[in-house]
Amino acid sequence: MDLYMMNCELLATCSALGYLEGGTYHKEPDCLESVKDLIRYLRHEDETRDVRQQLGAAQILQSDLLPILTQHRQDKPLFDAVIRLMVNLTQPALLCFGSVPKDPTVRHHFLQVLTYLQAYKEAFASEKAFGVLSETLYELLQLGWEDRQEEDNLLIERILLLVRNILHVPANLEQEKRIDDDASIHDRLLWAIHLSGMDDLLLFLSSSSAEQQWSLHVLEIISLMFRDQKPEQLAGVGQGRLAQERSTDLAELEVLRQREVAEKRARALQRGNRHSRFGGSYVVQGLKSIGERDVVFHKGLHNLQNYSSDLGKQPRRVPKRRQAAQELSVHRRSVLNVRLFLRDFCSEFLENCYNPLMGAVKDHLLREKAQQHDETYYMWAMAFFMAFNRAAAFRPGFVSETLSIRTFHFVEQNLTNYYEMMLTDRKEAASWARRMHLALKAYQELLATVNEMDMCPDDAVRESSRIIKNNIFYMMEYRELFLALFRKFDERYHPRSFLCDLVETTHLFLKMLERFCRSRGNLMVQNKRKKRKKKKKAQEQGVAFSRSPEELQAMWSALAERLLQCAQEPELSVDSIIPFDAASEVPVEEQRVEAMVRIQDCLVAGQAPQALALLRSAREVWPEGNVFGSPVISPGEEMQLLKQILSATLPRQQEPVEGDAEEEDEEEEEEEEEELQVVQVSEKEFKFLDYLKRFACSTIVRAYVLLLRSYRQNSAHTNHCIAKMLHRLAHDLGMEALLFQLSLFCLFNQLLSDPAAAAYKELVTFAKYILGKFFALAAVNQKAFVELLFWKNTSVVREMTQGYGSLDSGSCSHRAPVWSSEEEAQLQELYLAHKDVEGQDVVETILAHLKAVPRTRKQVIHHLVRMGLADSVKDFQRKGTQIVLWTEDQELELQRLFEEFQDSDDVLGHIMKNITAKRSRARVVDKLLALGLVSERRQLHKKRRKKLAPSCMQNGEESQRDAWQEDPEEEEEKEGLPESEGEENEEDLLAGQVQGSSSLSAENLRQSLCQDGLSAPLLWLQSSLIRAADDREEDGCSQAIPLVPLTEENEEAMENKQFQHLLRKLGIRAPCSGQETFWRIPAKLSSTQLRRVAASLSERENKEEREEEPEPNPGVPGEQSPSEEHQVRAPRALLSARKRKAGLVFPKEEATGEEEWKSVPKKQQLLDSDEEDTDDERGGQAAVSGTLRIHKEKRFLVEDEDEDY
């Protein structure tokens, strides 16, 4: 960008700074204001960073800001402003743009800003600029805390940030073209820091306990100083060439010499370059071309060995998302004087600063005083300086701060967190992989330091090492770490250096673990097992036994006498009977159904004492709702209750079917199965070979082979680690067949034909060993050649070596039974007969007819696929398991249909008929709620006009079903409710079946709540209702009013189930699931009705206005059998007995019940104060008697103005 293309205001501001003349900078009178204007311009730049680019093109920092910094240091306001502007101008490009842009235009701006930053770094590589910064920083640090102002602290932080920004600028390798031992710009910058004394100030900040607030800034600066260095090289500077280094260099030179000699020999065997016009063509026998004929070769015979079918072909382009990760870290050897300075800095830092600085940084990290990802600098410093300490003069005391079990745990936790985030955050997977590499290096150095402590002559150091190893080998997390890292290795995100470090760290860990096991007789380690329970989702089925009323009556006759005797025995104890399963994962509150089933099973089995004891014990555990009878129940009522339980149809759950171990790898294909994992911690004796077997899998072997492909670039130690691990798997475990893979054999062929193969003696020896084992096996098993094409697991390896079918012949009782020919014929017949039946699960039908050998659903499905009757197991997935997202067009269509039919009697029914994408009613209701088109589910209920005329009374059964039962279509909506709501509905249904109409009245509920100490919440509820009635009289409009509890006592009352039951009886609406939080007073209740509800909460009002309930008439003769009539009347008899005992039934009920019902006007409907769902269920039971029963609870007459609820 040219200077003359700058913005006019920006150009005028830069011109007002001053000018440089003869090495002296003359500032203008408005210099300070101009600097502040530039800061303000930078604050309002656009996303292309135009102001930053224009200032970089004009070289403002080189021509104006640096001279002002060095020559006008006495002008403190101007100096502070220039430092602020420099910090802003030099901030990293990644920080400016957020990330490396993918758009070409924005990426161009990113690279342009990076180019200007590299120019700034070159301008700062002078002793003069860093001298001014060092002097200023020294003067500020000399001030005590009582004399240091807030501006001084800000200036210290800005100077440290400026040094950090300058060091952070990456080097331009293409422009510099520096080689090792040559001074680069970064080396010149480090030398300027050394000459200015800035390094001494950094050491002071690191060691001072009073300056710990700058610890993270200092650690970041130090990490940037050493980012291109290797700690082993720095430790050996100035000590002459070691014998190990000389031998390594000689080996490298020998490899190069051997390859050069081989190339010369190959060139000598070739003919001259002169072309022979009579060279002719050759036919290569045994090598087929595309047309199944022998290949015709048109070149000289000396080129035949270089022939390949791929010659002339365009190489296949690898997609960008599948390309291997690139190496980002670059290591180079700096000039000698810089390396000497860095070595001395490291030695002094380790001796005086490492422990206090790392302790302060760790404290900041644990207290969350640091910024995000600052722990990466902590782990880099740990890896670098611990490696330098090992290579220089090993002194464990210098690194004692990071040599503990807590440090191992900290690094392991971060390493685990990084690879989990790499799997979840795919967009930033490369960044998480780099952090993961830093954590792995830190873990590697921790293990290397502990291993070095084993060789220390000091007994105390060796004892410390033994304690640390005992802890890390005991914990399962540290042993499983490397297995997890190998399984999660992905070459798209992890570079080759990460795999190299992982292989070397695993080799070190296994060597330490093996030596530790040998030094001890037996090693006890922690073992965590995940106990997997495969449980079918709750599938309700009918009662396990189907008996006629006559059989039930005969069974009850045999039980009645025994039950009556047991009920009258006072010594019947219930202390030893527990009606719930304490070890079950289902909460105790939700086990009432199972308790009822257990009572029924005891009655069916003829165990009268156990059934009675279970009933009484269940009554004590679940007293709410009187589902198992009231606490003061009489023996006669108890007998009637047991009879109802015996004849009731109770929901049962299907027993979970255990799957076989043969198909464990295909468990994920069954979406209807849940996997519940329970971690069990125990101790066991550790066996090294058993642990080594965990590495015998194709995923880990594939990673080792991938690294072995670059054996020429690998170090000798890396190749040794690869060969050692593969030798452990092949020789120690006897799994040579695990390495019988064609790609590995091609690599062995390349290795054996390498001219420098003598330099890889260990790899060559191992390759010959594996090839010899393969050819020995191939002589016995001809299928081994085919097995070369595939990666193998341990079971395939065993079959290859011991014979195919050896696993089936073993004594494995957990394997699935073999299908006989008769069973296969029956399976085929059943599948062909039922596969085309609509609305039927063909697998469930087959399972119901297969009685000879018990089979699982998974076994049947996989055998159908093996027989060729089905293409895939996915053809048998159960319906309704996948959630299909709504598209924008579908949402608009749903909104249009709702607006079209919202005034009709059946809104949901019309929508279901006309919607294009067919979905269940529950999904449509949920979407209507999510879009805000309706506020509650009841607005979508089908509207029915209920006419309570005398003609309706003639057919009591139909009229009652119309008045109290929900529409069957609405019941379908309940299937989509959450599990908790379904359980509540199931319990309510159970209570309705057993208890009948014996629910507590509002008066009894109020009295019970008063006895429980909830009088104050009742008064609050009464006042809220009166206040709502007053508001509706004043405003003249009605809307739902939430009941917001403001006191803790009222809030606890709103969570009380009995209090919530009272609210439902009073007509107060519960909050909609996922939409509302508080209970609400419905808008349909008028002020008069609200006052009446409030008055019903007072004791005196309840006694005066107590209504009477007529005694139900017996059923019409001839319509019911005696047993059915007895089953219907039994709950009513029990209820009447309880009411007579409580004094709630009056003689005049029978006379006034029918008259009260007939006095209801035609345009009014009878609304029970109880909740609609429970009333519908209980009303359905009452309809069996053929008469319309009026509940005793308090009722309210509500005008039916527009619609029925």
From Swiss-Prot:
GO terms for biological process: branching involved in ureteric bud morphogenesis; branching morphogenesis of an epithelial tube; cell cycle phase transition; cell division; cellular response to bleomycin; cellular response to cisplatin; cellular response to hydroxyurea; circadian rhythm. One of its GO terms (molecular function) is DNA binding. It comes from the Eukaryota. Induction: In both brain and pancreas, no circadian oscillation was detected. Expressed in all tissues examined including brain, eye, lung, heart, liver, kidney, pancreas, placenta and testis. Highest levels of expression in eye, lung, liver, placenta and kidney. Expressed throughout the suprachiasmatic nucleus (SCN). Residues 813-951 are annotated as: DNA-binding domain. Residues 999-1097 are annotated as: Interaction with PARP1. Residues 1081-1205 are annotated as: Required for nuclear localization. The modification Phosphothreonine is found at residues 1088, 1174. GO terms for cellular component: chromatin; nucleus; replication fork protection complex; site of double-strand break. Residues 657-676, 965-989 have a biased composition (Acidic residues). This is Protein timeless homolog. It comes from Rattus norvegicus. The gene is Timeless.
